């Protein structure tokens, strides 16, 4: 079987709440770390989420 093209990553909140989203990315197309402004329900605001590895 072939190796899957996408890998699962964790988007961790920069507000240090411990909240995170899980998404997929293709590391061949996107080599840099992903950052998004998404909603953090713990602080009830949009904050920046940065990519981290899933352990």
Curated annotation (Swiss-Prot):
Any GO CC annotation of this UniProt entry: cytosolic large ribosomal subunit
GO biological process, one term: translation
Keyword Cytoplasm on entry: no
UniProt keyword annotations, A-Z: Ribonucleoprotein, Ribosomal protein
UniProt GO molecular function: structural constituent of ribosome
Database matches in PANTHER family: 54S RIBOSOMAL PROTEIN L39, MITOCHONDRIAL, LARGE RIBOSOMAL SUBUNIT PROTEIN BL33M
Family per similarity comment: Belongs to the bacterial ribosomal protein bL33 family.
Protein's name according to its UniProt entry: Large ribosomal subunit protein bL33
Organism listed in the record: Erythrobacter litoralis (strain HTCC2594)
């Amino acid at each position: 079987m072939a190796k899957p093209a996408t890998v699962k990553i964790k988007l961790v909140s920069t507000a240090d709440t411990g909240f995170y989203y899980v998404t997929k990315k293709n590391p061949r197309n996107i080599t840099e770390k992903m950052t998004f402004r998404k909603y953090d329900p713990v602080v009830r605001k949009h904050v920046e989420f940065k990519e981290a590895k899933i352990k």
